[in-house]
Every structure is written in structure tokens, then in C-alpha cells.
Amino acid sequence: MLPQVWAAAERAVAAGMHLCLSTGRPAFGRALGYAQRLDPGGWHIFQNGASIVNVATGDSVSEALPTELLLELVATSRRLGRILEVYTDSEYATESGDRRAVEHAAMLGVPYVQRDVLSLSTQVVRAQWVVPLDGQAAVMAEPHPGMSLHPAGSPGMPDTMFISVTRAGVSKGGAVRRVAARYGLETDQAMMVGDGENDVSAMRVVGYPVAMGNAEPAAVAASRFQVGHVNDGGLAEALELAMVLP
């Protein structure tokens, strides 16, 4: 992130605000580092709301992906040869040797390790399809009973679509409610800054939804405020806005 964003975050925390990272990424690698720097004593939302972790204590109020649903996904992945990643709060696994799987590990900031996706020893909270951009529609059209799909792209891998799979009903919006309750706040006192389709559920439950200048149309439509592009320090602008709103 840009230096002015970190400076604005420090001012916000010093003013008594709770800052919460809300991301599709897991609570390890680069995303964990961002959360720890953003608000080192706070609760943060990872994995599209499936993983809610206090980065100071390691406590978790996460949502499990039921085993029977996981087994269905694994069977489909092995049958089609499609990249599937499986996540707990603190680690992940993939059986794929495809270059997208390798590149994604680097983007997450963790070593690439090929391993049995059913070998994880703690509670699974999410799976993720990793597909070419032109493969998104087919995956989204497939039946996923009992599950919610959360598609998102990344400028770090512009030719790839990441489709998170959680238990049905899990969303960033639900996670925002749970984090707000941890702080004794109502969601109408909260701000959500978003730019993607997977941010919309959270933007709809807060009192101050903000769209980045690079936001997708769905995020813009869900917003009350707009700030600059992420590459131009728009997040710092949003944090400054938060400090002057009633």
C-alpha cells in the first residue's frame, strides 16, 4: 500500500477508530501483514467472510465449510483437472501444478507446496476455484448446492478469476455484522470501502459505503461516497473522510 494510506490509517487508529481489513485472501502471508499493520489489536475479515480472526490473539469466529460439500468440490476438481484450493484459517492446500496455482502462492506471499487438499488438519472454512477469465461463466453456472460463490479478480493475475466457495449464507456483509458486534457497535456506525463485486454485501449493511475510483459498477451502485483510484491513494482519502463524518 502507498505510504499515505499507512499514515492515514495510523491517524485513524490514534483517533480511536477500529480498522478492519476485509479481503478474499486468507489470514496468512501478505494479507496477515496488512491486517497487523492496519490495526494490530483488532478483528479482521478474511476469505470473503468465512474467516474472522483477531490478529493479536489468534482467536477465530470463522464459518466451517461442511465436509460433505468439500468432498463434492474435491471430486469435481479431480474429475475435471480444475485448480481447487482449500483453506483453513491458517493454511491452505492445492493439488495442482498448473502455473496459476504456482503464481497464486507467490501473490499470497507463501511458498508453493503441492499437497493433498484433504490433508489439512484444522477446520476448513473455504475452497476456491482458480480459472481463466473465460472459465468464470461455466463455473458460476454449475450447481453448488449449499454453497455461496464469490468471484473476484486481481490486478496481480489479470488473466485469472478466483471463485471462492463458502457455506451458503457466508458473506463479507455477515462478517461485518459480527465484527461490529465484537466492538459493541451497530453497522450503521461503520464504513466499508470497496471496489469489487465481493464487497457489495458489506457495503449494503454499513451506514457509510464508499466506492474506490477503480470500483466495479456493482460496488459503485452500492455506495454513498466515492473516492480516488486505489493507485492514487483513494483509500487514504476514504480514511480521512471517516474522520470527519458524524
Can you name each region flagged by the protein language model?
Residues L2, V165-P246:
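Mg2+-dependent phosphoryl-transfer enzymes with acidic/Ser/Thr/Gly-rich catalytic loops
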Residues E10-A14, R78, P143, R204, ...:
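Anion (oxyanion) recognition and catalysis
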Residues R30-L32, V55-A56, S96, V139, ...:
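Short glycine-/acidic-enriched loop or helix-start segments at secondary-structure transitions
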Residues L38-P40, N48, A56, P143-G146, ...:
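Short, structured coil segments at secondary-structure junctions
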Residues L80-I83, Y87-V193, E197-V205:
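Conserved acidic, metal-coordinating active-site core of Asp-based
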